[in-house]
Amino acid sequence: LDVARRSRVPICADESARTAADVLWLAQCSAVRAINLKLMKSGLSQTLAMYHVARAAGLDLMIGGMVEGPIAMTVAAHLAAGLGGFSFVDLDTALFIASHPFAATGLQRHAHWDLGAAQAGHGIVLR
């Protein structure tokens, strides 16, 4: 707990934050300054609950992922863009997959996301 208080680098909870209750406990203990939200780690409804608890507690937010393909990464990008308030974005794991049949409309080289052309839905199409 002392690390987060003494560090100028924001300490971010990753695997230790799987539920809204975890986020609340981490905030109450002042254990971290940020929470890494991952849809595949917690699921959509729990991720939304974690988001709201973290915002209410004044914690910074990060959107990330496990080793997921373009569908999951694109959905996470849309979630983060729609909710707002994210200080850190780590949605590049789709770039690590050498071959898949999908084209993510927002993911570009160098892990840059551009959702400006997005329409209804997640925007994934077959190549």
Can you say where each PLM-predicted feature lies in the sequence?
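Catalytic core of soluble alpha/beta enzymes
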Residues: 1-74, 98-107
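Flexible C-terminal active-site loop/helix
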Residues: 66-127
